[in-house]
Amino acid sequence: MKFGKIFKKQMVPEWVEAYVDYNGLKRVLKEIRSYKHSKLTRAASRVSQQAEALHRSFSGLSFHPRHSERAGDIEDQVIKVDTVQEEGSRKLYETKFLKKSEEGGEFEESFFKKLDENLNKVNKFYRDKVKEVIEEAALLDKQMDALIALRVKMQKPDVDNLNLEKHPSDKVVVDTSDNTMRTQGTANTDMVHGIERTNIPEEEASHIMADIVPVSHTNGDEEEASIGDKQDLREILERVKMNDVLESPITTLKGVFGDSNEPISKKGLKKGEEQLRLVFSEFYQKLRRLKEYSFMNLLAFSKIMKKYEKIASRNASRNYMKIVDNSLIGSSDEVNRLLERVEVTFVKHFSSGNRREGMKCLRPKVKRERHRVTFFSGFFSGCSIALVIAVVFKIESRKIMEKNYGTEYMANIIPLYSLFGFIILHMLMYSANIYFWKRYRVNYTFIFGFKQGTELGDREVFLVSTGLAVLAFVCFLLNLQLDMDWRMKHHKTLPEVIPLCLATIVLFILFCPFNIIYRSSRFFFIRSLFHCICAPLYEVTLPDFFLGDHLTSQIQAIRSFELFICYYGLGEYLQRQNKCHSHGVYNAFYFVVAVIPYWLRFLQCIRRLCEEKESVHGYNALKYMLTIIAVIVRTAYELKKGRTWMILALVSSGVATGMNTFWDIVIDWGLLRKHSKNPYLRDKLLVPHKSVYFAAMVVNVILRVAWMQLVLEFNLKSLHKIAVTSIISCLEIIRRGIWSFFRLENEHLNNVGKYRAFKSVPHPFHYYDDDDVDKDD
């Protein structure tokens, strides 16, 4: 694999703009090569024209560049790199190309100008990130002081006077100038040059580099100073307060109606330890990514300079790489030292000194694709197609629809099985979304907050959906077979129980506590669903409101679940007739069920409005309130009919549809920006074909309008009406799948613009500094 592809693959998606523009530099080199090639072609033709005249004096003369034989002697005269000092001890590099007067020199000058821009950009980004992690390390020092003090207090409650000594490696000097961050040991650049000499494949080299953490060396003075740092236990405990890192409805209500401060218990300390483990793990991943960022950029500079030497026939690589080696990204050793400190601290305090167990937590294994997943996905999809054909043939061969009871029979069982059809279609759309997110490098695992190594890929989701499809079609086929079998005429209620058994199996798999069938993903879904149901008592995160939006597209599935409760709970299956609409309670819940998803999203928006104080959440809440009104009026029309209800349903649905469509395209997708680089789209697009975005907007409008068709009076039979309702519900699920891709694309681009590549894990302890005390006074 070429380095350009490996370089792109190894990038942190949210930091793409901060990397060396390797492809841009290659384009400049192509211009230089094209010019050199045309120059050599002209020179060769000139030589051939003079061949006869020169033949009598010089036999076999060939063209040679004038100064090529002495290129090695004038290497130092090709470029001159100056350092410009800026405020805050920051350095900028400026390269002067000394051969500008030569023919084609302006191309090479533009190459070095672009190279300097990339070097300065990379150094600036690296400097800012190193400053950020050093400050974060200082905060983690205070968190560890608090944890150790609380552990001692819990083990020995009577001890008040105890000095906590810090490990020599815990000393951190928060000085982010270029001079202090640069050390004598240039481990990264030495490693890069070693890889260049040994010809190790770049992809393998990047993994080697990420796994090696050089041992930092601390001078004697620094070590002596840090050993002398001692803190009193009582002083620390007086400054520490436990944060509510694991929010629950109880803690939320306590925060609203009273003081949530409570004495720290052993249970609370245990939760704090678990939270601090997550903080250290996330911090370690950030350090590793920063180390990989440094290494890959150094490798990119080395590769591009080798290409320049080959194309321009100039030996400028050594001089320029010396500058790169001495720059911040090539010489700073702060990240390596922090990596070592985190490993030592984590192993000592969170793994009982067991380094192997500690490193397993800090470096979770990368998830590998399994061939059996692909095999069973194909197997189940093939079985699903075969079962669909079998169902169609069964209905046709028994001529069910031509019999008197056939229509009524299908009208009874189709709503029951449609629940599973909606779920399967939704999962298939989610599988397609994951495939395209991965293809266009949308970091969906970070956006959703999935734990590394446990996230489901597109093939796993496809496997689950096709497996459920096989199960549903087998049950449906079995239902048909038993109903039509003359031997079962005395046990007519037995086939009616099959949909209930299928629903029980699905619920058992979903809530199964054993570590089978992707337990971590199932529990993540259950937790997000519970947060949605308990809105606004939980802090609203992206997975929560994303799931809430998807629930609004599953109104018909929720109503099918309500039908399950009525059909089996009230004993309707014993009469083999669906008369649930004759029950007043069912009709009341028929209203409520349609409103619940929108109401939950409304409450989530109100919670975010109160916390973030941003007006956009207020407008979003208004949008859901209008949708709630439209759904209520439409449901009332569906039950009561009448021209007045029809007009009210059309007006309310039209207003809600218009606002929802505008919100989808402009707010959620970030499109229709009139003055953007891409007219009527947005500045940054991940999909290279602009027509895809315009097509998606048109399809979204059409499918948004489709649900209004339910308001119109078609005078359809019961079965046909069920079919139309199911088709429109399927179209809404497809629309939601399309919406999901562009919604996460826009979220990813927002993260890219802010270089936000890691989730912020809340610290378990709040440590009061002297500055905080002064502010309180």
Swiss-Prot record:
Disulfide bonds: none annotated. The keyword Amino-acid biosynthesis does not apply. PROSITE patterns: EXS, SPX. InterPro entries: EXS_C, PHO1_SPX, SPX_dom. Residues 581-775 form the EXS domain. May transport inorganic phosphate (Pi). This is Phosphate transporter PHO1 homolog 10. It comes from Arabidopsis thaliana.
